[in-house]
Amino acid sequence: EIYHPSYVAKRMEIGAVMGAAPRRNVIRETSDPGDIIILLGGRTGRDGCGGATGSSKVHTDTSIETCGAEVQKGNAPTERKIQRLFRREEVSRLIKKCNDFGAGGVSVAIGELADGLTVDLDKVPKKYAGLDGTELAISESQERMAVVVDPKDVDTFLGYAKEENLEAVPVAVVTEEPRLVLNWRGKPIVDLKRAFLDTNGAHQETKVKVDIPSEEENYFDKWAVPAVGEKLEEGDVKGAWVALLNDLNVCSQKGLVEMFDSSIGAGSVLMPYGGKYQLTETQTMVAKLPVLA
């Protein structure tokens, strides 16, 4: 954790996911006109509407009263089913391209898979009735994936999804014309040129002026903890040491580490704490990637 006044309202959290797969199973192809896009996984609800923009706006102590619905509801069992499905060699080779449903929901997850698309929002599986076209298009409900497959492979892919007890529905088709079309209740509610989407509607240019770094304002000469620099200038080494220890950024992270199980999957090579008494912080992360034989 990094402690700084700028993170009082919103924390900065950074995570990473790594995986490995045999090269023969990783297919990277273009989406061709006529290809079918299948939505599989969890159903779509109102949770997550506006989450992408909500994470970038100013929040206060009253935000929870109006922004609670922006937080997606997780569905771990369905996520596990998707993982099992994608680990099957015969399934991964059918997928030409795929995308996860992060920020923007259907409009982005499917909208990024090809230049020309026609999406039928009425086919999107719903958690409950009453969702309008906008909600179906932007909901960021989790545990969903969009995959592009050849028309001849649609039934085969749907069969594999059924074997994993996953809902899978063809919801879009790749078109020749570079336009994103979203249909709802038989009518287009979005019909935009790809060129417009790629440029945000305008040709953009910018001029940049970079100042020559100043020796007097050298960032690397500044102390992260100002009190340390002040004490050192006074020649008070002990005071500088105490000032540094008083900063939260040098405190032990053991309490945070203990909130997570580092032994899950039996893949950890070096645990977060090691040494004779298991109290010495490990300065790196080393783990085995889970692969099938």
Residue ranges and their predicted role:
Residues 1-293:
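Glycine/proline-enriched, intrinsically flexible loops and inter-domain linkers
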